[in-house]
Each structure stands twice: as structure tokens, then as C-alpha cells.
Amino acid sequence: MAEYKNYTLNFGPVHPAAHGVLRLILELDGENVVRADPHVGLLHRGTEKLAEFKPYNQSIGYMDRLDYVSMMCNEHAYVMAIEKLLQLEVPERAKYIRVMFAEMTRILNHLLWVAACGIDLGAMTVFLYAFRVREDLFDCYEAVSGARMHAAYFRPGGVARDLPTQMPQYQKTRFTSKRKAKKLNEPRQGSMLDFLDHFVVDFEKSLDEIDTLLTDNRLWKQRTVDIGTVTAERAKELGFTGPMLRGSGVAWDLRKTQPYEVYHKLEFDIPIGANGDCYDRYLVRMAEMRESNKLIKQCVDWLRANPGPVLSDNNKVAPPKRNAMKNNMEELIHHFKLFSEGYCTTEGEVYVGTEHPKGEFGVYIKSDGANKPYRLKMRAPGFAHISAMDELLSGHMLADTPAIISTIDVVFGDVDR
């Protein structure tokens, strides 16, 4: 009589649905997954140790390269941890700018997620719709920092510069006709706040388009409903955070439960799911984008009415004004000291957790009073989610694997560090 054995399959690390360098060793019984063993570490770059050998203010750029889809949200937790060590006051305007860009980053992350998830499940159109909208937000990144991705815009004590009064303009190129450039530039004639007023209105329409494409789509529901189900109790036991936890029906969001910056002054809801499956996680992220859009609008209205400083006036932490530096020896010394050796913090340890688009992103710093951390540890939300891969995949078909991996929304820049 023939002997039947389970089949072992290597999924990744170069599979297009692996979302980075994920390697899964799957044990299959026919087309059913019996066991899944995730292997991580293929993108390890030693970020924590690198930051321990540099002054605090020279490691902000490393944060952008952790979860390289949610750049400013990584910076946010890091600079807040430094501010907590220094007991540094941040100008109110800078707090609103940070929150506004954190919510823009959340939208950037979720749009890329729904685009990639759509491609994984065979819905190509949503990818094109989502990337069209992301360009507008990348223009905002570029306007404040000069970079479209790795901005390094947040600073201990505030942000690098105030919002621009003129948005970057599109030019006629080989790929952009003069007529198209003129149309793209229509909402970009004023300040960034004017541009964002246009954006929050247009973005609601864009989300409605994606909703129409996917939410009630029969094929989309067949691929996501009752797939990768996790109960609320089990999600808490597994250490889930963010949309993975809220998709299981747990209303836990650090912006509400442990508010930081100015979130306690803003109005927004926490969307939660009911069944804890892939479809609920999709619905939660779609609803979160609408809430982020409301938060951006509230920040725009406040910033328009309240001009002011955007960086601390403590020149031991924040660089002095350039014209002052060129005319005053004291400011020149502050500038030289800041960019050569940085600043020393008080001895102690701090932990700051923020509501990152993927979950709780935390930064732990232990300081011995020097100008660099004695120990820096980062909590990546994706690590706990990857750890549950065996439980999520077991009992499902091999074809469901891309759907489950996709709704976890993992990026290996922060998992492997």
C-alpha cells in the first residue's frame, strides 16, 4: 500500500507575496497547511548597535530605514524618547505638525497595504488607484524635507522647519505633458495647508472608489472572510497590537488609551472588527484612513490659526538660527558642539510607545549620561505578528497563505532591524 507523507515547501524569501525577505517552511498535507515555521533575520543590519555608537541627534536617519513604509512614525517614537530623557518642552505648533505628518504616514502605509494586498489576491486596479493618491502625500514629504521617503524631519524639540508657503510644482517632462502638469499644479498654487485642504476632500472620494472596488466584491470576500481568524482573547495573548488587535474586536489604540502629543485634543474614533479575520482587518484599515483624514483636517485648521515656533529655543539641543550663528560667537559654539558631539542626557531609562500604522512601535533607551545611548531597544509590532504565523496558517489552504501574510502587514526593516 502506498505511504503518504507530508510535503515540506519553502515559501520565500524571494516569493513575491512574502512582503520582504520572509522565509516560511510550510508542512503541507496535500494543499492544506499543517505547520508553518517562519525564519527571520535576513534583513538584519544591526541598527540598534549602530545607534549606540552615534550621538542621539545623528541616529534619526536610521529610524526612517526601519519600517521604510512608515518613516516619520518611526522618527516620532525615537525623538519623543529623547525628549523624555531631556525633559524637553516641545512647542505646541510642532506637536500639531508631528501629529499631522504621523497621520499622513498612516495613510501612506495603509494605501500601500491595500495596494499590495490587492495584487496578492488578484485585484490589480486598486494598486493603481492607491499609488495615485500616495503621490500627493509624498509631495508633502518632499516640501518639508527635500526627500520623498526618508525625511528625517522630526527633531528632539520639534521639527526641522515650519510648513512651506509654496508647494513644489510639477514641470513638463517626457512623461508629463504641459497640460497634465498644469492640471496637477492647480491645487499646489498656495501653501501646504491650502494643498491639504484640497487633499482631505479628494481623499474621501478616492477611498470611496477603493470601497466600491473591494468591500462588497464577491471574489474579495471569498479570499478574506473566515481566513486567518484570531479571537480577541487569543490576539491579546499573542501580543498583537494595531489593526491586528483591533480587527479582532479589541478597542486598544495608544492615541486614545495612552494619549501623547495633542491626540487628547482631537476628535476621532477607534474602528474595530467583529470576527478577527482577514476581511475585518481590511475594514479596520479602511476606516482608519478615514479617521486619519479627519485628524489631518483638524490639524490643518489649528495650524492655520496658530502661527508660532516649531523647534525648541534651547540651543544645546536645537541648532541656533543661521544668521545668529554667523554674527555671534556663542551661537557658533553651540552649533559646533551640537553637530560634533551632540548633547548629553540625564542618567536613566525611558520607554515611549506610539500608535504606529502597524501596531505599537516602542523605543527603550537606557542612558549612562553620555551623548549616546548605553542601550537602545526597539519594539517592532511586526515581530509579534510574525511569531503567530503558525497559528494563523495552520488548517488553511496553501492559496490562503498570501492573503494571511498580506493582512499582517509586515515589513522586515523593523522586524529584523
From Swiss-Prot:
Listed name of the protein: NADH-quinone oxidoreductase subunit D
Record Pfam families: Complex1_49kDa
Assembly and interaction partners: NDH-1 is composed of 14 different subunits. Subunits NuoB, C, D, E, F, and G constitute the peripheral sector of the complex.
UniProt KW keywords: Cell inner membrane, Cell membrane, Membrane, NAD, Quinone, Translocase, Transport, Ubiquinone
Catalytic activity of the protein: a quinone + NADH + 5 H(+)(in) = a quinol + NAD(+) + 4 H(+)(out)
EC number: 7.1.1.-
Gene that this polypeptide is encoded by: nuoD
InterPro entries noted in UniProt: NADH_Q_OxRdtase_suD, NADH_UbQ_OxRdtase_49kDa_CS, NDH1_su_D/H, NiFe-Hase_large
UniProt lineage: Bacteria, Pseudomonadati, Pseudomonadota, Gammaproteobacteria, Thiotrichales
Key word Glycoprotein present: no
Topology relative to the membrane: Peripheral membrane protein
